[in-house]
């Protein structure tokens, strides 16, 4: 008690008043301010080294103020250098920080998105004035971004009109055409088959009537791209016969045109082609097809009556199952265009394709088309990979590569059945999109196709290419190889297809083509590769070594492909576990055929 009294007395003497802070602010935080005298920080830090803690009012400018300051800097950059595209793009991108500071664009509400789109459109329109017409790539970049924002602010019909107006000034712009086609074809609300079909025909006519179409390679490939989109659209909407017939007609028209028509007008050429088509002789890809030019010289035999009536009937006990089976059978039998003499056993008015159904497309594509681009578009439609020819790839414009990446062109004719029957494996059946080589052609380029022309278990859902479609593609490639006897790359491509789809026939076909072209080292390598893939290693090595020994008999141009023989031979050694032989061949590469002679 005495101690307590002593403490109380000292407290009363020393603290008989209350000390207030000089500041008039009232701190709601019960914790002592770090700058208060006598605080813990005064004991740890000397006064001159105490850390300064800023209040919220003293922090750097807010996010809104930062965004405005950055906006001023970007505007200044565009004024200093108006031709700097990146400065304009940065300014447009920054607009989202003005609309909603410190908030990600994905979290914006619809009204904020439209406001942002309007701001960016204004930036792009101002930027376009700074770039003249001769700077097409820069203007195209700005236009694509402007159209992307316009799709947010404009109604569907106005957006399509905006795209159409833009296309009038940029008829050969592949990205803008793609946007336009997607807007017209992929609108589920306003989709009408006839409207979309008319749209494609009108677009082909517009592009085909361009005066520069005959000389502009990009314009030619845009015509091919439109044709691909049109025929894929027909096939996907159930008009398979018209889709296939369109490509048959285009191939006959552009690849097998009679020579005496070369200098005549379009109307005369179309009239002559009408006679050929309405004669109903075998057409491109069909059995017995010889081409428009051959038909023009030889009338041949009248077409035979074909009966394609299905054998199955509806079962009263299982009506739905039997109907499904019969429907699948009819789809396979009626897949390809029919003839008026056929007996399809139904009342399908679209099974027979007349010239009048094709006339508008042919008239719109009468301009000369590049052979390389045309063949690649045809292969894309069939679902085949690109050809192995780096020189062609370097010569073709970017649009040829782009249509290989188009989501609307993912599944070609050879893959269409797989896409319908098994949706779980769509990604596995996509067309390969990469630059092929000889090794890839004979390994995985055709891996999505069947290695057999008949289903393994008879199941309608077997993951294999339908025999009739594979045979159709086979006849097309065979006709092209005969049409271009000097194109060894095309012949190699055909043999790789044979190995994948019809392996039992591949060796015989390879020997036949090699006999016709005995000076092609590429075809020697293809023949040997086929034998090796079929398990006939000794025969493959015999072909490789025999061709290597004949090196001196080949021309200098042909010897440029001599490396293919050595490469194939060495890989064959490795795959058969003959490492020492492979090393020996690798060491003697380029030194003639001494090592081959010593082994034999």
Language-model segments: which ranges?
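Polyampholytic low-complexity alpha-helical segments
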Residues: 1-600
